[in-house]
Amino acid sequence: MLTTTSVGSTTHEPLRLMAIHAHPDDESSKGAATMAKYVQEGVQVMVVSCTGGERGDVLNAAAQELVDQLGIHEVRQREMAEAAHILGVQHEWLGFMDSGFTEGEPLPEDAFALVPLEVSVPPLVKLIREFRPQVVTTYDENGGYPHPDHIQTHVITMAAIQAAADPHAHPELGPSHVVQKVYYNQQFHKARVVALHELLVAQKIESPYVE
């Protein structure tokens, strides 16, 4: 297992990475290979899903029958559990409701994006203090793309990291912890798209990236 030594300390701490995402499936499309790499190297990895993805769309027609039978919430719970198993990561839910991608329409009243920070931040502070990651990954201030849950995930992540480091903030949630590094997922860039396109072409699979 990989370990790190804090400045001024001889104590070796296991390396830990926390990946904070908006919905189940985001962990698989944004950083899955990175997480699998570090798990293989002995790093402890935790995925945190802010919502259950209850208002997501079914893009795979083959899955529609199962969604009709069990409901999208149950299907996404099962998919997340399987993804965590495949990646070899720990997983936690924050339990907020998917806001949906309304594209200009008002958000539902129970939307994660509308939850006050005094409600949404403390559960994440608790997880950070319990898991004690040296590194956190999440989205930038634009959410990677303008989904309200992705933007809100950035907001609560940065607020929780700051609060987790403050021994005077939420002392009831455990001893303070300083996250050493924060990285933003940057999946929408040319090198990644080209690599995906070439891989699909090599496997004789129709590529959506032809243009």
Give names to the regions the model predicted.
Residues 49-51, 84-102:
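A conserved beta-strand->alpha-helix junction
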Residues 56-74, 100-103, 107-113:
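Acidic/histidine-rich helix-loop elements
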Residues 24, 54-55, 98-100, 143-144, ...:
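Solvent-exposed loop/turn segments at secondary-structure junctions
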Residues 42-44, 89, 177-180:
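A short helix->loop->beta-strand "cap" motif at the edges of active sites that frequently abuts
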